[in-house]
Amino acid sequence: MEDVSDLPFRTICKELGADIVYTEFVNAEGLVRQPPVEHRRRGSDKLLFRDAERPLGIQLYGASEFSMETAAHTAAQRRPDLIDINCGCWVSNVALRGAGAGLLKEPAQMRKVVERVIGVAGELPVTVKTRL
């Protein structure tokens, strides 16, 4: 969850017995574009975690298979325990751009995204968050 599951929140969750935690969801486009230093919180800083948080998943969202592939490659280099693709966020500024739950309306595009992420994840498991 954006602006919720940051490092302090994840640490508290682990201390209270959470089996697994996830990063805030990371915008693949923003990560690929590498915004200026003052905007880094929107991208690569969200990939930071401590070993004490493990197991931990990095959650990515985006509509383009190309940006998702690049973002997944970057995420995999951080060595999380898994990569999660967000196909469940219904917030309009995400879904109306074809990301999050917006991918559920385009199964062929969703498949491309998932295949590209799996292709660069290596041995890391890849999961997909959806909504029914």
Feature-to-residue mapping (PLM):
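Hydrophobic "anchor" residues on beta-strands that sit immediately upstream
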Residues: 20, 82, 125
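Glycine-rich, positively charged N-terminal anion/phosphate-binding segment
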Residues: 3-78
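Non-cysteine beta-strand/loop elements that form the S-adenosyl-L-methionine
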Residues: 23, 81-91
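Active-site glycine- and acidic-residue-rich loops that bind
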Residues: 62-68, 125-132
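Surface-exposed, active-site-proximal loop segments in enzymatic domains
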Residues: 91-104
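A structural signal for short coil/turn segments at secondary-structure junctions
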Residues: 78-79, 121
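Alpha-helix-loop-beta-strand connector modules within alpha/beta enzyme cores
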Residues: 42-57, 102-128
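Active-site-proximal loop/turn and secondary-structure-junction residues that shape catalytic pockets
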Residues: 27, 62, 89-91, 132
